[in-house]
Amino acid sequence: MKKNFISIVTPCFNEELNVEKLYLEVLAIMKSLPYSYEYIFIDNCSTDATVNIITKLAKKDKNLKLIINARNFGHIRSPQHAIYQSTGDACILLHADLQDPPSLLKEFITQWEAGAKIVLGQKVNSEENKLMFHLRKKYYSLMNKISETQIIENCTGFGLMDREVVNIMREMNDPYPYLRGLLVEIGFPITLVPYKQRLRHGGGSKISIFILYDYIMLGITQHSKVPLRIITIFGFMISFLSLLIALFFLAAKILFWDTFIAGGAPMLIGIFFFGSLQAFFIGVLGEYIGSINTRVRKMPLVVESERINFK
């Protein structure tokens, strides 16, 4: 069956300085290709003029569609919902900040035409903060040491997914999906397209330290049991060490009954040490329990307040 329809998805939140420029770049690229297409923006309850700008553009272009969320459903759920609303033979995820070059759309489609079911852009260099780029590399290195599936380094989800891949993800029905891990778990070979990431075009980054932490813990809790195993092993080791220390103090007291004074300092240090370890381990367990709770609630990815140009 001939494949001739492409979906492009862009999640946005307060991107009034970027959405029109991004739209015009994508429009120019898609006009040069022999494909019908739809361009879906999903707005995460922006407080600036983002929705107004996209709405005006959509009045002139029926290929441009807009989903407006009832509230901000976060950086994980909103993009995934938009991917599921796409109807193309392939779906391309493109971020709104213009750091990822829209010009790569042609290469993604070329690789797809050659048979690839998943094509991802891979950052080989970046104009962003050097420290952040280095920390991201360390994160992927850590993930691949502890993960049951190998996460592809420096891939943010920017790329193309065949309709079959989108349908498989929809059937999984994960209420809080880690996209870059999900694509690897599906099992199809992934074609990588290297590129240099640009600086954000306009506005400030929407990625806070809390969002980065959420990404990290989502990846770990979904793809690794290593932290849980470490807790088990460490707990056994500490128990054994505590027994040895207790035997040492007992022997010292018996042998040097009159002169050996245990004192309160070792006990106080031990209490604080083991208390802090317990708090840390409870926090790790809490992350896994929170992840389970998110899934058993079976909440929808998002609730929409409005759609524009959808039939």
Regions found by a protein language model. Give the residues of each.
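N-proximal low-complexity "stem/linker" segments adjacent to membrane-targeting elements
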Residues: M1-A28, Y35
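Short beta-strand/loop segment that forms part of the nucleotide-sugar
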Residues: T10, Y23, Y35-C45, I67-I68
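Acidic helix N-cap motif at the loop->helix transition within catalytic regions
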Residues: L17-K21, D48-L57
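Short aromatic/hydrophobic "clamp" motif used to bind/position activated sugar donors
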Residues: C91
